[in-house]
Structures are given as C-alpha cells and as structure tokens.
C-alpha cells in the first residue's frame, strides 16, 4: 500500500498544498516550526480521522479559515481508493471513493499507518492511557469490529458512571442491567487486545533480539483489571467481579474495573523495561514499530505506510540501519528532519522535499522517480 498524492486545504499552517509522493522513501527537510510535523499529521489524520497531537479539531484549522479538507489517492493491492475528510463548524464528513461513510469503523482501515514519533518513547514509562491508545489504534486498523465494540463499551461505561454520580439511591437491578451490557462489550474488547498482544509479542521479540545483537529478549504482557483463567471465561469473570465491586463503585461513583483500566507491561530479559536504559527503551519501541508493520501486513495483505516524525536523530547509526533494513523497499516511508546529516544508508529511490513556512517544494537535485 502507498499514498500516491495528498491535497491539503486550510490545514494548520497550510492554506493549500498538493504533493505527489514516491512509493518508497519521502523526506521532508526544514527548520523547526515550518510545517514538517503538520504534514505528517495530515497523512495520519487522513488514515485515522484523528490527530496524534491534539483532541481538538479546531486546532487543525488554518487561522484564516473555518473548514479543512484533506484528500488523498491510495494504491492498494485490491485497487485504488480516493479518501476525503472534511471538517467544518457543522461537523465531519468522511468519504471513500466519493461515498460518505456512516461509521468510523467503515472508514478506518482503508489506509493503514504506523507512526513513530518522539512521544512514543513514553510508551514504556508513561501513563497507562498511552498504552491503551496504542492498542486501540493498532487493533482498530486491522479489526473494524473492534472499534464498534470499543465505542459501545465506552457508551455503556459513560452511562454507568453518570448513573453512579447522579443517583443517591442506586437501583441494584438497573445497575446489573448495565453490568450485563458492559461485560458483553468489554469482554470482546479484552479478547481482541489479548490476541493482539500475543501476536505482537512474538513479532516484536524477533526484532528486538536482532537489534540487541542477540543479547536481549522482549516480552509483552497484557495486564487486565479482570482476573480470568482463559478467553472463554472473560465475560463470566467480568460480570462476577462487576457485581462484587458494586459497593466500592457506588462509594467512589465510578467503574473501578474493565478494559478502560487495563495496561500492558514490557519486559527485557524478564526485567520490567521501566528500569531499562534509554538505549534499551529506544530499541524496544523500534522493535514494536517493526512488529506493527508485519502484523498489519499479515492481516490486511498490504504493508502500512510508515511515518517517522523527527525520530531519526533519536536513533544511533546501528538502530537507524536496523530500521531501514526492516522496512526495505516494501514500506512507503515518510521522514521529517532538520538535516540529512542524521540519516544513514538511504536508498536510491526517494524524494526529498523542502518545507518552509507552510510551503512544500521538491528538491530537484536529490529527488528520484
């Protein structure tokens, strides 16, 4: 899979931009605060209908305007797709091949992406919500039903929490009805996550073993707030533990267990990776990203698009080499950087773009078809 071109209208500091890409490597070079990250964010947004930097769509709109449009042509093994996202004060419209998509789960997955940004280094030591977001984005791209089930779970969770916060005399019968619905959707969310982590663990360990020059093994554990013995019993245990938590939940006025409380833990040679060195943690995240690429390829039969936002300078030559070896010619890759000096072992087939104050121009001397 690769994105052939993109058109931006009123996106961040871009009033208008149209760019044709190389199917291999695309490098965006320029000083800080010129729009390099904004451009990669636009590709990410076109794929996932969300930014990795902000929850507010208003921040994506050029200061002179009130609407945004991003369009792109994607080439897949199954054919060409035209993607279109429009944001306005009236709301959001997503289209695939000019047809409106009623549900988020109908749109996401048309173009798959893997993002590697500086904030990803917080996946090891950061808040559990970062790791849950990582799971939700990855699983959502390869299993559309996951997004629907997660959305339903969050809807019932919000109902349950609102009821607990606003009701002085809780009706246990009504609470049990909400428990049933929460356990239905939540158990499926946990099952999807559990399966994904098992597959990710196997693939990431292979990459980490190579990157660490065969010195380290990586393992990833799903840490559920629900105690269960096997996948078939998740719903039963979830429902039972929800019932047991009624008194606590009524007192605290929120739902204390469920996938919204879950986490993942990383181990290097059986030692919690929060105690690992910065170099080891960088290798871990790099291994995760390479594993994401392979898992998406396995499920969808198409390689995802790789977005490397200002991370090459964070990697030494050894890790850069392993990253570029891992993607080879199969993965269309976008790199932002302030200088080419940080980059090593670049392939012959690439395009280099200059970015300056919301304007993109091709570097003719260094671009190849």
Curated annotation (Swiss-Prot):
PROSITE patterns hit by this protein = RECF_1, RECF_2
Q: What is its main location?
A: cytoplasm
Record key words, sorted: ATP-binding, Cytoplasm, DNA damage, DNA repair, DNA replication, DNA-binding, Nucleotide-binding, SOS response
DNA repair as UniProt keyword: yes
Q: Which Gene Ontology BP terms does the record give?
A: DNA replication; DNA synthesis involved in DNA repair; double-strand break repair; SOS response
> Which compartments is it annotated to reside in?
Cytoplasm
- GO molecular function of the protein, one example? ATP binding
Positions contributing to ATP binding: 30-37
Quote a single Gene Ontology cellular component term: cytoplasm
- Quote the function comment for this protein: The RecF protein is involved in DNA metabolism; it is required for DNA replication and normal SOS inducibility. RecF binds preferentially to single-stranded, linear DNA. It also seems to bind ATP.
Q: Which NCBIfam families does the protein's record reference?
A: recf
Q: Which family does it belong to?
A: Belongs to the RecF family.
Q: Give the protein name, as stated in the record.
A: DNA replication and repair protein RecF
Give the species this sequence originates from.
Streptococcus agalactiae serotype V (strain ATCC BAA-611 / 2603 V/R)
* Taxonomic placement: Bacteria, Bacillati, Bacillota, Bacilli, Lactobacillales
Source gene?
recF
